Design a protein with these regions (language model features):
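Short, charged/polar low-complexity linear motifs in solvent-exposed/disordered segments
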Residues: 49-51, 61-64, 216-217
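A short, surface-exposed interaction/processing loop segment used at functional sites
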Residues: 54-73
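Active-site loop segments of alpha/beta catalytic cores
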Residues: 37, 68-248
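N-terminal basic, low-complexity leaders that serve as flexible interaction/assembly modules and, when applicable
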Residues: 1-55, 84-88, 94-98, 105, ...
């Protein structure tokens, strides 16, 4: 048992998007509004500092007219290796901590629990404008592929790929079609470099347990046993005998 220091090993920037941020206080509450100006429209978000978390009052997608600007915003992302701080922290905490990095969320999960839209909004858009949602998904797929080698070549020995997957929202068919291929792609790159890859599966995983078993993931991070979820530790060990369970 030790401290887990979660750190990125790459830097993200958008060279053709102008970002402005305004932060203010109302009593003891701290708010931030961020605007992203693209050639095809301006996007904004509105969040509140919650101390150990962030309360998200507004995300980027507010109407169907925002899809074009969001596509531009996502396509403009550039990634550069940023290994120095991770390497420094790993050396400094060698005796009592480990450093773990991340690829970010899975492409579809980025649209469910990321910064584009809320989970409720995603469910509505998935039913009403699925083609638009999938246009964002395809951009995110290509973006993640640009990150795989950067992370695999970093000092990080083990890396999470996404998580907070909610099977009640997506169901097993969507999970198999839109999640599994990306675990396979990322794992192939990581394993080629002798690195480990896992995912933050902390929810009711029973209906996707067989699919998880078919992934090349090395560990299941934040597995939460029953009664808090619908799988016991014994059931998880039986379902995933070749994977390390990192208990939540």
């Amino acid at each position: 048992m030790c401290i887990v220091n979660r750190m990125s090993v790459f830097h993200t920037h958008r060279p053709h998007v102008l970002t402005r941020q305004h932060t203010w206080w109302e009593g003891r509450r701290r708010f931030t509004r961020t605007e992203h100006e693209t050639p095809v429209g301006t996007l904004s978000s509105f969040v509140e500092d919650g101390g150990f978390t962030t309360w998200r009052h507004e995300l980027l997608l507010k109407s169907p007219e925002d899809y074009a600007a969001i596509r531009y915003f996502l396509k403009d992302e550039r990634y550069e290796p940023d290994y120095a701080e991770f390497d420094r922290a790993q050396r400094a905490g060698a005796d009592d901590s480990i450093c773990r990095s991340s690829f970010g969320l899975e492409p579809l999960q980025e649209l469910i629990s990321g910064n584009v839209m809320s989970m409720e909004h995603f469910c509505e858009e998935w039913m009403e404008r699925r083609d638009e949602v999938l246009s964002l998904y395809e951009i995110l797929v290509e973006n993640r592929r640009k990150i795989y080698s950067i992370v695999a070549e970093s000092p990080a020995g083990h890396v999470n790929y996404g998580g907070n997957v909610t099977p009640e929202i997506i169901g097993p068919k969507v999970f198999e079609k839109y999640y599994l291929p990306h675990y396979h792609e990322a794992a192939e790159v990581m394993h080629r470099h002798g690195k480990l890859i896992g995912c933050h599966f902390d929810a009711n995983n029973r209906i996707i347990a067989d699919a998880i078993a078919r992934t090349p993931l090395d560990y299941i991070e934040a597995f939460t046993p029953a009664p808090d979820t619908d799988m016991t530790l014994a059931e998880a060990r039986a379902a995933w005998p070749d994977k390390v369970l990192w208990i939540n």
